[in-house]
Regions:
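Helix-loop-helix "hinge/cap" segment bordering the ligand-binding cleft or interdomain interface
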Residues: 126-128, 154-238, 260-306, 360-394, ...
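Short, flexible loop/turn elements at secondary-structure junctions
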Residues: 48-52, 79-84, 93, 104-108, ...
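General small-molecule cofactor/ligand-binding pocket signal
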Residues: 74-80, 294, 330-332
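Carboxylate/His-rich catalytic cores and anion/metal-binding grooves
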Residues: 120-150, 206-210, 220-259, 310-326
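Glycine-rich, aromatic-lined ligand/substrate-binding cores of catalytic
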Residues: 201, 278, 284-287, 303-320, ...
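Long, His/Glu/Asp-enriched segments that create or flank divalent metal/ion-associated functional microenvironments
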Residues: 65-66, 317-320, 445, 449
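Conserved small-residue motifs centered on glycine
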Residues: 380-503, 508
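Conserved N-terminal structural module of periplasmic/extracytoplasmic solute-binding proteins
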Residues: 2-10, 21-201, 213, 249-258, ...
């Protein structure tokens, strides 16, 4: 047992004893005492993140106010701004005086979960799920793959998941992420241009945007220079543009840079010839002044600010409505280079999934009550609100109106947002945390969001037909040893690849640089990493 674990055990011994007694006493009570609302107000403690420039007190958000009224459970929150979360949550998890009963929006990686489990900072939840979490149990019963994805190699579940189904397989909304590529249809029409279908045609369109900058500025009242194409490298990423080069793998996984071949082999996308050739082509665009010079360093707010000024001809994002006027844009289909292909995002065939969304800590004096309260987040009527927002707000916009489904049951109907940005309204209302929104819920408990529906339609129309890849890397829960071994090498591998992407687009790449790059990745442990990924892929398909 390591020193940190011994120290934590000494500090928490008294708290754990009290917690065990409370848990045993709850179990022995009559059934109605554990049904909400509780007879007396009870206080639990939790940690949560919130988006910058939104309400910082969770208990002032309508969702949590309603939950307190319905349960008689008051939550004392430690609220941390989202852009400070990673640093502060790490410190809080290491300090018993800062720990709360649960961490609502943990967002922990597998490495985090297994480390905190080893230190006994968090508790296993599988028994609580089976005994007092009927909503989550129902999700696991209907979709057993999610329980499998939450369970470690020793059979423990250390966290409660976030699950969002919007489509399935190659039509799932997550198959194309922040790399969805949009082109300014208003500009195309004004200049008499067609939507490009090849990389050569695409370059010609960008040149036309550049060469007709003054006409575009005059016609549409644009202040500031015309930017033929912008993105945020390794975030709002241009990987779809190079998907057709070489073997057609592209590079959609900007965290791990892996893909799965049709022969079920895990490969590194960044060591394929198509990766090099695609970035060399993008260097040509950069040399022509067709790419925003800030695309490699800008943050989200800068990116959006320029987009809202109407300066972009092409850009990448989850939803163009967050950047510019939706009606002025259309999706850019896959471009033909050596081939034509769209590589889906890894893990996307089972929908949106986050294994480490919420944890219960060892300081919880009544973990059963904590789990009962958290199970309410998986109620089919509650989950959509936690995920997107709610109804009955006092401000200008609501995400939902309270309506009825075809059977007369209550249903959340998405409300019109006018010119408001969907992400801004959602951030003002939603609370996140553990939840499950399933395809079965649409038109029963909630309508499909308009912005999700048009995105689903776009994927099915423009991208699914060109998803020639049969497999994506699935969500797997590796052992602590393999997780640690990967963590030891993945960071250097990812940093090297991400840095090379920016460098090669700006400065080009020589054959010697390419060989040195591959040698560096091998020295960092690329082959060992691929072996670990392959082991779990083989096991996944052997089941």
């Amino acid at each position: 047992m390591n020193r940190n674990k011994r120290l934590f055990n000494v500090l928490t011994a008294g708290v754990l004893a009290a917690g065990m007694a409370a848990s045993l006493s709850i179990t022995g009570m009559e059934e109605e005492s554990s049904v909400f609302p509780l007879a007396e107000t009870t206080t639990l403690t939790g940690m949560i993140s919130y988006p910058a420039n939104t309400e910082s007190d969770p208990n002032k958000r309508t969702i949590f106010k309603r939950l307190q009224d319905e349960t008689n459970v008051e939550i004392q929150w430690t609220a941390i701004q989202a852009d400070q979360w990673a640093d502060k949550i790490a410190l809080n998890m290491a300090n018993i005086s800062e720990l709360t009963d649960f961490v609502f929006s943990a967002g922990f990686s597998d490495s985090d979960l297994l480390r905190y489990a080893d230190q006994e900072v968090i508790i296993p939840l599988e028994d609580y799920i089976d005994s007092c979490m009927p909503n989550l149990s129902a999700v696991f019963e209907k979709y057993p793959e999610y329980r499998t994805m939450c369970t470690d190699v020793d059979g423990h579940i250390w966290a409660l998941p976030w699950i969002e189904q919007l489509g399935s397989g190659k039509t799932a909304i997550q198959t194309v992420g922040n790399n969805m590529t949009y082109i300014n249809k208003k500009w195309l029409d004004f200049l008499g241009l067609e939507i490009p279908t090849t990389v050569d045609e695409f370059k010609d369109v960008l040149i036309a945007f550049r060469d007709n900058a003054e006409k575009l500025q005059s016609e549409f009242g644009i202040e500031g220079s015309i930017i033929p194409m912008s993105f945020i490298m390794n975030d709002q990423d241009p990987c779809l543009l190079i998907n057709g080069f070489g073997e057609g793998y592209g590079d959609p996984d900007t965290g791990r840079h892996i893909a799965v071949t049709d022969d079920l082999e895990v490969i590194c996308t960044a060591t394929q010839e198509g990766f090099k050739d695609g970035l060399a082509w993008m260097h040509e665009l950069y040399e022509e002044g067709l790419i925003d010079p800030e695309a490699f360093t800008q943050d989200w707010s800068t990116y959006v600010s320029k987009g809202k000024s109407g300066r972009y001809g092409v850009c990448m994002s989850w939803d163009i409505a967050n950047i510019d006027n939706l009606a002025d844009w259309t999706v850019l289909p896959a471009l033909t280079a050596d081939t034509k292909n769209v590589t889906p995002q890894n893990g996307s065939f089972t929908g949106g999934f986050e294994r480490g969304r919420c944890v219960v800590t060892a300081v919880a004096e009544n973990p059963e009550l904590v789990c009962q309260w958290l199970d309410l987040m998986y109620d089919p009527f509650q989950s959509p609100q936690n995920n997107w927002g709610t109804y009955g707000e006092d401000d200008d916009y609501d995400i939902f109106e309270l309506s009825e489904n075809a059977e007369g049951g209550k249903m959340l109907k998405h409300a019109p947002l006018g010119d408001a940005s969907p992400i801004e309204v959602r951030e003002a209302e939603f609370v996140g945390g553990p939840l499950a929104v399933l395809d079965d819920y649409y038109d029963v408990y909630v309508t499909c969001p308009d912005d999700a529906q048009y995105r689903l339609d776009w994927i099915e129309e423009y991208y699914t037909p060109d998803m020639n890849t049969e497999y994506v890397y699935p969500n797997v829960f590796m052992s602590q040893e393999d997780t640690e071994d990967l963590a030891d090498v993945q960071d250097d591998i990812t940093k090297t690849i991400n840095a090379a992407k920016s460098d090669w687009v700006m400065n080009g790449v020589t054959d010697d640089q390419w060989e040195d790059f591959k040698d560096d990745l091998e020295a960092y442990g690329l082959s060992e990493a691929l072996e670990i990924y392959q082991k779990y892929l083989d096991a996944y398909y052997a089941e």
